[in-house]
């Protein structure tokens, strides 16, 4: 049975609450031990120690303590941690898997509540004589449960009322006046340390992640790590690795693109709803709505992904296009990023799966997740996903092209080209952030060769240089220098600064001839453009919002508008031009900007004429249905009935036989409006009889021979 621990600090409140800055208070709220390491009180505050009341102490304090309790409530809320479910792990070292923040010396101590009234405890000074030790059986048994269930159950925390402390001389620590180890009770020795219970390999994983990125030292992320370890304990992947390792690698990918603690924590927990005992409510209680909503969003995307894979939706171009558009429109884009990170690590370890599954996952990734990464603008993830899929879908071509790429690479030529450009920039007084060599991704080369019917020698941008400068003006000045140093290939200059790509990519591209025979592509961009190119929608995480053209919230709104706008315009152009693919159709406004008078502008708060897409499950088969705006369940049912040649034995249309469920829940109002991304299940409805009566009737028909007659009359079952 889960029992929350009651905890108190071993130092007087002055050592904890008299901090002179908000940063010190924040440090205290993150779980640092306030006892021996507390700074000496300032002269202004050392003589004003007051009793701090809160939590359960409000039940027992004098009337004068009530105002103090209310005033201290906000401060105390950050200092007390919910430790429900920990008693087994802390008390007996069992496999309960409880969590607490890892600390060198925990400030939490256990009270002897069984043998002493809480009233004198809450009012006694910190230096009062120690009371008798708890019995060995105190932490187990019905007495403990009865005690806690009577008045402590679900308590958020508790505190001690301290008696005023006399002023201390300047420079003398409060710990001198009050014994740091003296409590109103003695401490069970084995309870003094409240360390998380987890496997040794898990601690190694956490240490490794912390060495790779500092965000894994964050309190929220550490808490998410231990909860993920508890949720996935004992689970392994097909490769034999612990499941927790996949969670950590997913979170590391997110950390590398600059994700904050909320997103990284959700990355650690992204599979808990689908693959463990945890549900949304538990995550919400432990981490709040921010993390819980993201984990739930990833779970929904995973569900749709599985449906698409099982029904081979990726092979149907129209439905695949609708599906990944729906992914972007229906979910927080951060949930899509987490799902992409999850898929990227899965693809990196795909060798552990059987060959058939490798092919299926690679095909789905290429058709669904690569376009997602492209539209979000995360070039590095897109390239990695494409190359892995290319290796498994076209192994022979991949091997041949890899060999040719290695042969064509000339390191000496690249080095001399870099040196020449560096000297030219310095001579003209152009500073830059970075200058490096690059090469086109393997799949991009292959795709270009197939699309334009070229040989590898005809692809001019396989190798190149990338220059990152300070300002947009520097981009064009550097371009002039490049064209003075080398002859350029006619028709190969592209100005993506004036004409950005659909996903927001901006840069200058030109192709030059080195030593007269070797084509090199040169990319020139600013630092902000480089972040946008590498991290796309996540680029705002890489620099302060104050330096952005669009704030984070505005970008989220514009993202949702752009996705729906793009789809509305693309489908309109598709109908008029007969194009089979809509990727090449340009939206009316470039992302993330949007003109106010655009006829296709969309927000979730206003009416719009754009279509919605819903997942329809009928007889375990999935399809992605396009419906007009404001469509209802009845509209979908009528479409199903109209498109089906079958009728029921009672001559009702097929839709009358079906009982719809929306997002796995029965609906009472068939006129309910459908939303983007809804999952509608159409299941046959049994007659209004009990199942027993239904079986008995079938048995009687069989015994009378009527079953054969009915079968002959109605024809064989389809």
From Swiss-Prot:
GO CC annotations, alphabetized: chloroplast
Classification via InterPro entries: HD/PDEase_dom, HD_domain, NT_sf, RelA_SpoT
UniProt enzyme class: transferase
Record-linked PROSITE patterns: HD
Location relative to the cell: Plastid, Chloroplast
Domain HD: 243-347
Catalytic activity: GTP + ATP = guanosine 3'-diphosphate 5'-triphosphate + AMP
Enzyme Commission number(s) from the entry: 2.7.6.5
Compositionally biased tracts (Low complexity): 19-39
Keyword Kinase in record: yes
Family matches, as SUPFAM superfamilies: HD-domain/PDEase-like, Nucleotidyltransferase
Region (Disordered): 9-48
Alphabetical GO biological process terms: guanosine tetraphosphate metabolic process
GO molecular function: ATP binding; GTP binding; GTP diphosphokinase activity; kinase activity
Keywords recorded for this protein, A-Z: ATP-binding, Chloroplast, GTP-binding, Kinase, Nucleotide-binding, Plastid, Stress response, Transferase, Transit peptide
Transit peptide start-stop: 1-68
Family: Belongs to the RelA/SpoT family.
PANTHER family given in the database record: GTP DIPHOSPHOKINASE RSH2, CHLOROPLASTIC-RELATED, GUANOSINE-3',5'-BIS DIPHOSPHATE 3'-PYROPHOSPHOHYDROLASE
Function of the protein: Probable ppGpp (guanosine 3'-diphosphate 5'-diphosphate) synthetase that may be involved in a rapid plant ppGpp-mediated response to pathogens and other stresses.
Protein name as catalogued: Probable GTP diphosphokinase RSH2, chloroplastic
Organism expressing this protein natively: Oryza sativa subsp. japonica (Rice)
């Amino acid at each position: 049975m889960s029992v929350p621990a009651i905890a108190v600090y071993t130092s007087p409140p002055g050592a904890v609450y008299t901090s002179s800055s908000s940063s010190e208070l924040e440090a205290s709220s993150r779980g640092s031990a306030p006892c021996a390491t507390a700074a000496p009180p300032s002269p202004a505050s050392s003589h004003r120690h007051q009793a701090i009341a809160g939590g359960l102490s409000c039940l027992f304090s004098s009337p004068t303590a009530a105002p103090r309790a209310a005033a201290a409530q906000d401060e105390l809320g950050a200092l007390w941690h919910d430790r429900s479910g920990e008693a087994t792990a802390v008390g007996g070292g069992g496999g309960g898997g409880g969590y607490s923040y890892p600390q060198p010396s925990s400030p939490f101590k256990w009270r002897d509540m069984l043998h002493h009234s809480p009233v004198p405890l809450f009012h006694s000074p910190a230096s009062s004589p120690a009371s008798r030790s708890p019995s060995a059986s105190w932490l187990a048994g019905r007495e403990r449960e009865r005690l806690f269930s009577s008045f402590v159950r679900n308590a958020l925390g508790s505190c001690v009322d301290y008696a005023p402390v006399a002023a201390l001389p300047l420079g003398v620590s409060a710990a001198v006046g009050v014994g740091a180890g003296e409590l109103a009770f003695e401490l069970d020795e084995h309870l003094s340390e409240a360390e998380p219970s987890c496997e040794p390999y898990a601690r190694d994983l956490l240490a490794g992640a912390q060495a790779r990125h500092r965000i894994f030292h964050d309190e929220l992320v550490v808490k998410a790590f231990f909860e993920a370890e508890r949720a996935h304990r004992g689970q392994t992947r097909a490769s034999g690795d612990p499941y927790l390792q996949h969670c950590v690698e997913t979170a590391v990918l997110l950390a590398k693109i600059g994700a904050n603690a909320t997103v990284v924590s959700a990355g650690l927990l992204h599979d808990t709803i689908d693959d463990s005992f945890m549900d949304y409510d538990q995550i919400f209680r432990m981490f709040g709505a921010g993390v819980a909503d993201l984990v739930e969003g990833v779970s929904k995307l995973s569900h749709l992904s599985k449906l698409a894979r099982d029904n081979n939706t990726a092979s149907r171009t129209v439905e695949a296009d609708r599906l990944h558009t729906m992914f972007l429109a229906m979910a927080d884009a951060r949930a899509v990023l987490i799902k992409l990170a999850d898929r990227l690590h899965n693809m990196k370890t795909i060798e552990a799966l059987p060959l058939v599954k490798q092919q299926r996952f690679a095909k789905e990734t290429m058709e669904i997740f690569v376009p997602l990464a492209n539209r979000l603008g995360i070039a590095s993830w897109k390239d990695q996903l494409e190359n892995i899929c290319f290796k498994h879908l076209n192994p022979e071509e991949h091997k041949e092209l890899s060999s040719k790429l290695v042969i064509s690479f000339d390191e000496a030529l690249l080095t001399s080209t870099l040196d020449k450009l560096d000297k030219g920039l310095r001579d003209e007084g152009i500073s830059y952030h970075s200058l490096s060599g690059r090469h086109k991704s393997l799949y991009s080369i292959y795709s270009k060769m197939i699309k334009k019917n070229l040989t590898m020698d005809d692809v001019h941008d396989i190798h190149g240089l990338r220059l990152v400068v300070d300002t947009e003006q520097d981009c064009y000045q550097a371009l002039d220098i490049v064209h003075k140093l080398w002859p350029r290939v006619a028709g190969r200059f592209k100005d993506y600064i004036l004409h950005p790509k659909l996903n927001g990519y901006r840069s200058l591209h030109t192709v030059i001839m080195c030593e007269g025979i070797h084509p090199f592509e040169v990319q020139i961009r600013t630092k902000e453009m480089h972040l946008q190119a590498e991290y796309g929608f996540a680029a705002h995480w890489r620099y302060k919002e104050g330096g952005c053209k669009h704030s984070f919230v505005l970008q989220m709104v514009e993202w949702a508008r752009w996705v729906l706008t793009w789809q509305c315009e693309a489908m309109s152009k598709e109908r008029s031009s007969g194009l089979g693919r809509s990727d090449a159709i340009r939206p009316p406004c470039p992302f993330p900007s949007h003109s106010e008078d655009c006829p296709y502008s969309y927000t979730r708060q206003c009416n719009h004429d754009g279509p919605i897409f819903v997942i329809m499950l009928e007889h375990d088969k999935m399809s992605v249905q396009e419906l007009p705006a404001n469509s209802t369940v009845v509209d979908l049912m009528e479409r199903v009935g109209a498109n089906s040649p079958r009728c029921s034995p009672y001559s009702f249309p097929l839709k009358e036989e079906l009982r719809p469920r929306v997002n796995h829940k029965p609906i009472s109002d068939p006129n309910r409006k459908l939303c983007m991304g809804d999952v509608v299940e159409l299941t046959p409805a049994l007659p209004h009889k009990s199942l027993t009566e239904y079986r008995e009737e079938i048995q009687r028909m069989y015994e009378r021979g009527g079953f054969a007659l009915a079968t002959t009359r109605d024809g064989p079952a389809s």
